[in-house]
C-alpha cells in the first residue's frame, strides 16, 4: 500500500484550513494515503522537525518541499501565531521589509546589517542533506521539490518557473499549475 509523507512549507501545506481552495496536496490526498505535515512559512529547520515527528518506516514515499534559504526559525511569530495557516511561520526578509509593526524593526535591521548569507545557506544545505539521509536509511522513495530560484544539494525538481508564471491562491499557484504539480508528483509515485 502506498503511504505518502508530505513535509515542507506553504507550497505543500493545506490551505483549505483557512481558505476555500484546494491545491496539489489536497488532490494528492484524494488519491493516496497522505500524511501532510507541511506548515506555511516555516524554515528548513522546522521542515526537519516535521520529519523528526514521525517514524519514516511507516511511509513508502516522501515528498519534501523545501523553503527559502533565508528563513530564520522562531518559536512564536509576533504577527502570525494565531493565524490558522501561518501559525508556524518563521521570519523571512520579504515579510519584514515593508511591515510597520515595531517588534519587527530589529529583525529588519538584522537582515540588512548582520545577515550572513553564506552561513545560512551552509546550514540550510546541511539540513536538506540530513533529511535526505534519514529517508535513505529507511528506504523511503523521496522526491525533493523547490519553488524557489536556487539549487538544492540533492536531486530535485524545481517549480520556480511555474510559480513565477502561474501565481494563484492555493499553494501560491493557480489551479492549472496545481494540477500540473499534482500530475508530476502522481506520475513519480506510480513510477
Tell me the role of every PLM-derived stretch.
Residues 1-46, 50-56:
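Serine-esterase "nucleophile elbow" of acetyl-processing enzymes
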